[in-house]
């Protein structure tokens, strides 16, 4: 190793586990584990180390890789001013990944474990299209039929909670660290929903006794590939699973931990009952901002996000739409300047070291638009204004879903509903109202005549003149 690598300054052998974390991926290792590493470096919380765990084959591969390096994770911050590398030592073990999750259940039953945290991805919570828990999913049905041999994280959590209840041990707190709104509520619905399928008494006990705090997490963390491994080698580290990330990180969470928690407020975590306000700010400004730059960039054949932000038309379009149509409808956030948050987001989007792609930002628009863009559309209309920038964005999304860029490059399928979207975009070219008629995206907004007229004009202009020309005209207005 070289001197430029920061290593744990505390005695890792003195750590004892207080947290089981299910789903040890890149985000967890660049986020929760880093915060705990910082806390341990202060000489505090040494009984809150992490035991890694997982329920999928990919978790077994991660366990093998980390075990070979004493469960240390290399985390490289991609700051344009210079990369920084550290070895994070907050994890002291990684449980065997087993089909019946016996080792995981046993570990979570240990009274020393007071928090079970999860990063199982947004799609790992067994919800249906409406966002409700889906009791008919085959994995859930199987766990309900064989609760002593669960295959899912939620089945294992329930088995451990039942063991703790029967032994008179205080239940652990279940803490989702996934990037989805109301993640505590979603997790509670999954755990209780599964319990109700096979043990109503256990379900009632979980409802009454187990805490599921909501939290907002944020840090851009790319997938690991050859480039990331090369970066680690540049620091003298032969790590097959290094993590790269942006310098920025944020964690906002409800202070609802009946079994206790580490003092993470000492290392920058915000504990507040107002998590929803922070979520709304992030969803409207960051996630909504991603959508604003995604589709015009893609139509203009700009492939990288930082390159899009370096294009004066794209950057100006983002800023104008945010300031005039999104920010005015973001509810106040405690101790936060909304304009300063926008400045931060624009800076993060512009980081050339991250190499995020516009195609990733365009992904899954049929699910993202209703969450990230349509609420701002509605708020503007309710205030008596037609948000021309957001309407133009909707037209650009429609044009993108037609399946070609302005130069004629074919857009590969980029949405779970791509075929249906492409068919509708083709019909909308002649009849723009077809696009707004997607009630699963726009609800009843098609009935707003002013919106419908503005959308029709915008889509016609996009087809006639192309994305670059319509952005230039919009910005000149």
From Swiss-Prot:
UniProt keywords, alphabetically: NAD, Oxidoreductase
EC number from the UniProt entry: 1.1.1.67
Name assigned to this protein: Mannitol 2-dehydrogenase
PANTHER family: MANNITOL DEHYDROGENASE 2-RELATED, MANNITOL DEHYDROGENASE DSF1-RELATED
Biological process annotations from GO: mannitol metabolic process
One Pfam family recorded for the sequence: Mannitol_dh_C
Key word Phosphoprotein present: no
Assembly, per entry: Monomer.
GO molecular function, one term: mannitol 2-dehydrogenase activity
Residue sites binding NAD(+) per the record: 19-30
Reactions listed under catalytic activity: D-mannitol + NAD(+) = D-fructose + NADH + H(+)
InterPro entries linked to this entry: 6-PGluconate_DH-like_C_sf, 6PGD_dom2, Mannitol_DH, Mannitol_DH/Oxidoreductase, Mannitol_DH_C, Mannitol_DH_CS, Mannitol_DH_N, NAD(P)-bd_dom_sf
Family: Belongs to the mannitol dehydrogenase family.
Keyword Metal-binding: no
Listed SUPFAM superfamilies: 6-phosphogluconate dehydrogenase C-terminal domain-like, NAD(P)-binding Rossmann-fold domains
């Amino acid at each position: 190793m070289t001197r430029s690598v920061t290593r744990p300054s505390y005695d890792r052998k003195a750590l004892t586990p207080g947290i089981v974390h299910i789903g040890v991926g890149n985000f967890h290792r660049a986020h929760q584990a880093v915060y705990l590493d910082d806390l341990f470096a202060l000489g505090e919380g040494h009984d809150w180390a992490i035991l890694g765990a997982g329920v999928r084959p990919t978790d077994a591969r991660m366990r093998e890789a980390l075990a070979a390096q004493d469960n240390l994770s290399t985390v490289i911050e991609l700051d344009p001013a210079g990369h920084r590398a550290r070895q994070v030592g907050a994890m002291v073990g990684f449980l065997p990944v087993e089909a019946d999750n016996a080792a995981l259940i046993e570990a979570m039953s240990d009274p020393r474990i007071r928090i079970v945290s999860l990063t199982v991805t947004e799609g790992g919570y067994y919800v249906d299209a409406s966002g409700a828990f889906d009791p008919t999913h085959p994995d859930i049905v199987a766990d309900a039929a064989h609760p002593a041999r669960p295959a899912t994280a939620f089945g294992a959590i329930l088995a451990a909670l039942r063991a703790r209840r029967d032994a008179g041990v205080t239940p652990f707190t279940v803490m989702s660290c996934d990037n989805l709104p109301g993640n505590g509520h979603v997790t509670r619905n999954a755990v209780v929903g599964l319990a109700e399928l096979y043990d109503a008494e256990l379900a009632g006990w979980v409802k009454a006794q187990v805490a599921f705090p909501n939290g907002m997490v944020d840090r851009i963390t790319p997938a690991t590939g050859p480039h990331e491994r090369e970066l680690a080698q540049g620091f003298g580290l032969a790590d097959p699973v290094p993590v790269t990330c942006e310098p920025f990180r944020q964690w906002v969470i409800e202070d609802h931990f009946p079994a206790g928690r580490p003092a993470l407020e000492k290392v920058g975590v915000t504990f507040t009952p107002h998590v929803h306000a922070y979520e709304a700010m992030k969803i409207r400004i960051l996630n909504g901002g991603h959508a604003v730059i995604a589709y015009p960039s893609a139509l203009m054949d700009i492939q990288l996000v930082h390159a899009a932000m370096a294009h004066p038309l794209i950057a100006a379009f983002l800023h104008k739409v945010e300031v005039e149509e999104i920010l005015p409808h973001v509810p106040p956030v405690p101790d936060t300047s909304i304009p300063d948050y926008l400045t931060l987001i624009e800076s993060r989007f512009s980081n050339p070291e991250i190499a995020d792609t516009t195609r990733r930002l365009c992904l899954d628009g049929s699910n993202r638009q209703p969450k990230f863009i349509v609420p701002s559309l509605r708020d503007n209309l309710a205030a008596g204004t037609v948000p021309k920038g957001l309407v133009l964005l909707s037209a650009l999304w429609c044009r993108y879903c037609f399946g070609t860029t302005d130069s004629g490059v074919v857009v590969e399928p980029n949405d779970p509903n791509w075929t249906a979207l492409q068919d509708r975009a083709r019909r909308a070219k002649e009849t723009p109202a077809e696009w707004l008629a997607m009630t699963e995206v726009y609800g009843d907004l098609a009935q707003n005549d002013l919106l419908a007229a503005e959308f029709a004009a915008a889509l016609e202009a996009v087809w006639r003149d192309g994305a670059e020309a319509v952005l230039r005209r919009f910005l000149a207005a």
